[in-house]
Regions:
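Short aromatic-cysteine micro-motif
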Residues: 112-245, 318, 326
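C-terminal, surface-exposed recognition/capping segments
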Residues: 206-207, 211-224, 229-230, 237-240, ...
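A general structural signal for short secondary-structure junctions and capping/turn motifs
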Residues: 36, 41, 47, 51, ...
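Extracellular adhesion/carbohydrate-recognition regions
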Residues: 73-168, 261-317, 370, 403
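Short, solvent-exposed loop/turn segments at secondary-structure junctions
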Residues: 99, 134-135, 176-179, 257-258, ...
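Short secondary-structure boundary/capping segments
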Residues: 185-190, 258, 267-270
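Charged, compositionally biased non-catalytic regions
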Residues: 55-81
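Short, low-complexity N-terminal tether/leader segments at secretion or assembly junctions of large
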Residues: 1-54
Length: 410
């Protein structure tokens, strides 16, 4: 008979063998489970990847179909550009033209390609300009019809919202605005717009729905209208495919121009890449008929001059605490005896050789830095127009009657 010690030793050996077998089984099971998990995960990843690819493909098909539909329906005059945020932007194609071909001889605009179609002297075949004012969208802005324009943004925010869209995007320039305005004048299709609280002050039956649902012409409330909701006569070519709402509704920030202590500063052609510090300083100023710096009312009409001899506020003061200059028509202001006419400023509708041009009032402060808005807003009546130019405000100003419009280089 075996001793108790031998039996205990045998049990220990058997237990160790069982433990080893159990561990081996556990490892085998764990390995098989890991393999199953890997196969499951691989299958899930494959399914998700296939889904994402198909979803992306459907998105591409949908967006491409939308673009083709817009282009087809407009005969190629409109297109859709999706920005890096994925937001749609319906754009008007503006083809290059020669200034002399406009036939606007009395405006003394010179010859050659309009500067809107040149960048650092190199001509462009066409430019794309937002058909509508910019509106709020995911992570940025969009250019679509039938919505409220994005307002209450200052100059720098408007500019950044445009460049945020990606390469070749920019805030509409003073060059692009003027080119469209001059083409409209030559074509006999100068637009009207929302200039009287939801209606045109000229043809009051031309209306669009207001943001406050108010009646057309009711001066209470906010008379701002949805983008592109007016008749085709509110578009620059009087068709449904033209740039909308340039006149009235809301003022529009423009790039590549400013007024510095009364001096007019612009880029020489349509080049948003030029740093603001390198913009060209023209020998052109908005002088004042008086050096009054009391109050905040009008000091009279600006005088186009080769120097600012009288200012209505302290130099480099960007506030609106002092008098301003205003005239009912930008083209009718007096030119000082020593002023040398400037062809580029005529091409930009800042100076004019005749009053027989587009309408619109001019306002300015000849002290501090002032940035341009054009077109007028819903309550400006006869003061609104393609020529309307306000240089009242600093870059930091933001108002519910000021919006912006993106443009794109192809």
């Amino acid at each position: 008979m075996s001793s108790i010690a031998e039996e205990i030793a045998g049990l220990k050996v058997a237990s160790a063998a069982q433990t080893a077998a159990s561990q081996a089984l556990s490892q085998e099971v764990a390995g098989k489970m890991a393999a199953i998990d890997k196969k499951t995960n691989d299958s899930i990843v494959k399914v998700e990847s296939t889904y994402d690819q198909k979803a992306a493909g459907l998105t591409i098909i949908a967006t491409d179909g939308y673009k083709k539909a817009i282009e087809h329906n407009s005969g190629g005059r409109n297109t859709v550009v999706y920005d890096v945020q994925g937001n749609p932007n319906i754009m008007c194609v503006i083809p290059r033209f020669n200034i002399e071909d406009l036939g606007l001889v009395d405006l003394n605009l010179g010859t050659g390609v309009h500067p809107a179609f040149q960048t650092n002297g190199v001509p462009r075949v066409e430019i794309l300009v937002g058909k509508y004012l910019a509106s709020s969208a995911t992570n940025g802005s969009a250019v679509i019809g039938g919505v409220q324009p994005l307002t209450a943004v200052n100059y720098d925010v408007a500019k950044e919202l445009c460049t945020r869209k990606g390469a070749n995007w920019h805030l509409m320039s003073v060059h692009e605005w003027a080119a469209i305005a001059l083409w409209s004048l030559a074509n006999g299709t100068v637009p009207r717009g929302n200039t009287n609280y939801g209606r045109s002050h000229e043809k009051k039956w031309e209306t669009a729905s207001r943001s406050d649902n108010g009646a057309p012409g009711d001066v209470s409330g906010t008379g701002r209208t949805d983008t592109g909701k007016g008749p085709s006569t509110w578009n620059y070519d009087h068709t449904h495919f033209g740039v909308c709402d340039l006149v009235g509704n809301v003022w529009e920030w423009l790039d590549q121009m400013k007024l510095d202590n009364g001096q007019i500063i612009t880029t020489l052609d349509n080049n948003p890449a030029v740093a603001e510090a390198n913009w060209h300083k023209h020998a052109a100023y908005f002088d004042s008929p008086t050096d009054n710096q009391t109050g905040a009312g009008s000091a009279g009409a600006p005088i186009l001059s080769n120097a600012a001899t009288k200012r209505n506020g302290p130099m480099n003061d960007d506030s609106n605490d002092y008098p301003h200059l205003t005239a009912s028509h930008f083209a009718a202001i007096t030119k000082a005896a020593g002023y040398v006419p400037n062809e580029l400023l005529r091409k930009l509708l800042i100076e004019s050789a005749t009053t027989a041009t587009v309408v619109g009032y001019i306002g300015a402060r000849n002290y501090g830095d002032r940035f341009p808005v054009r077109g007028g807003s819903w309550g400006h009546g006869t003061s609104a127009g393609l020529g309307a130019l306000s240089l009242y405000n600093p870059r930091s100003f933001a108002g519910g009657d000021i919006g912006f419009r993106p443009a794109f280089f192809v």
